[in-house]
Amino acid sequence: DDKIYFFFTEVSVEYEFVGKLMIPRIARVCKRDQGGLRTLQKKWTSFLKARLICTIPDKNLIFNIINDVFTLKSPTLKEPVIYGVFTPQLNNVGLSAVCAYNLSAVEEVFSKGKYMQSATVEQSHTKWVRYNGEIPNPRPGACINNEARALNYVTSLNLPDKTLQFVKDHPLMDDSVTPVGDRPRLVKRDVKYTQIVVDRVRALNGTIYDVMFISTDQGALHKAISYENGMHIIEETQLFPKFEPVQTLLLSSKKSRRYLYAGSNSGVVQSPVAFCDTYTTCFDCVLARDPYCAW
């Protein structure tokens, strides 16, 4: 892809309350962005950002702090899937969630979604509203593609000032990126998730499973697999005896010998992705539902 995506949490600019409302974002820039010739000189001409939704609507639960993301790519997937680990803004809630987003849903928002503009009339707590006016051509924030080149816009330096001024004034999208299934893949009580990696595994019977490895702020690792239309935690491992936060989590690229590497302030731990030797009978192995293991 010719685009770069990055994730962060920021204070809401759309609304203003007594307490600061935090919003999880995904932003996008183009790799070949050279800035503008006059407007946005030596600055991004393609910067756009949108809200990431991770909520349980029927329970009015909002997970608005993003802690980590992982992009799952696989030949068995039609497109990359972005997994994000979220917690609520209020620390006393004691919940964590994992939401997944198709890359096409992200691109739909940036390439076809509505923009926002600063509110011209004071409307209680609302500071930004949907922009319903005319959108310049080429589309603001879009990367230089064949359509733009056909109009003689070869680089961002060629883009008209009207397009550049628009993206400078309207970097925020009105449309939000919604998760797969419109709800979290996993919600866990009494835990704060910090990092995530995801693997895609074909079991001995040919069934493909998504396996999530999620670390906690107490030095533990949860392993969850997809079956029966849901994610289920099948294993918990204590990685660090001092119950310290896991700050980095990596999955080795070698398919033959899969290992996880977890880092904290005190050190690094190497762990296998599965402990198959703990299942001493066929019944125990099947009951564990671990796609890495077979009897």
Swiss-Prot record:
Gene Ontology, cellular component aspect: extracellular space; plasma membrane
Per UniProt, residues of the PSI domain are: 275-295
Q: Which residues form the signal peptide?
A: none
| Gene Ontology molecular function, alphabetical | chemorepellent activity; neuropilin binding; semaphorin receptor binding
Tell me what topology the record assigns in the membrane: Single-pass type I membrane protein
Which BP terms does GO give this entry?
Answer: axon guidance; negative chemotaxis; neural crest cell migration; positive regulation of cell migration; positive regulation of inhibitory synapse assembly; semaphorin-plexin signaling pathway
**Keywords (A to Z) from UniProt:** Cell membrane, Developmental protein, Differentiation, Disulfide bond, Glycoprotein, Membrane, Neurogenesis
Q: Which residues form the Sema domain?
A: 1-273
Q: Which residues are glycosylated?
A: N102, N205
Q: Where does this one sit in the cell?
A: Cell membrane
Q: Which SUPFAM superfamilies did the record assign?
A: Plexin repeat (SSF103575), Sema domain (SSF101912)
Which InterPro entries has this protein been placed in?
A: Semap_dom, Semap_dom_sf, Semaphorin, WD40/YVTN_repeat-like_dom_sf
Q: What is the top-level taxon of the source organism?
A: Eukaryota
Q: Which cysteines are joined by disulfide bonds?
A: C30-C143, C54-C99, C276-C293
Instruction: Please describe what this protein does.
Output: Cell surface receptor for PLXNB1 that plays an important role in cell-cell signaling. Regulates GABAergic synapse development. Promotes the development of inhibitory synapses in a PLXNB1-dependent manner. Modulates the complexity and arborization of developing neurites in hippocampal neurons by activating PLXNB1 and interaction with PLXNB1 mediates activation of RHOA.
Q: Which PANTHER family match?
A: SEMAPHORIN (PTHR11036), SEMAPHORIN-4D (PTHR11036:SF18)
What protein family does this chain belong to? Answer: Belongs to the semaphorin family.
Q: Subunit structure of this entry?
A: Homodimer. Interacts with PLXNB1.
- Protein name stated in the entry: Semaphorin-4D
Q: Which gene encodes it?
A: SEMA4D
